[in-house]
Amino acid sequence: MPIFTITFCAIILVIYLLDNFIVIPKTETVTLKEKLWAGHNKGYINHALHLSEKKIKKGQVWRLVSSSLLHIGTWHIISNITATLIVGYAVESQLGAVKTALCFIGSAFISGLWMAFVYKLHEGEGASTGIYGLIAVFVMLAVKSGTVFFSPVPTAALIVLAVYTVGGMLVGKATAWEHISGFAGGLLMGFIFI
């Protein structure tokens, strides 16, 4: 049973629901469309956890990783949970929960460093930095075993993961760099844990 994968998906879903529907400052106006589909970054949790170069420099270093717990919009959370379930299950079936969690966190951390201090991103959210890290680990495991079918993940799910991987590179320059740096972090984590 993929303990890390399921637990992480549950955590990001709860944070998404709380931040989008419940813990919004009374001074903020959030439309029903923003709550249900488009998303917003006006909630208390988002303000406390999103990636911010300025706030990291002031000592709020948790933001290098905590931003991976946040999502803006229904499509964002659905696509990231789906990808996490697929690649997380595949990697966790080979490495176990602890190493998979460390690969995810390490990838998110490396991407956070890159995006905050090299790219100078002023605000960032999303688990995709860690997911792309797990995708890198998945690729390394596939190369090591000689096949992408090294895990119990069905072929259809691997196709969905491939679409997610390619599609995630086409949504914008900043997002592409988040994904590239997360993938690079995953390669480093893979060299450590595989």
PLM regions and their residue ranges:
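A detector for small-residue-rich transmembrane helices and their helix-helix packing motifs
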Residues: 1-194
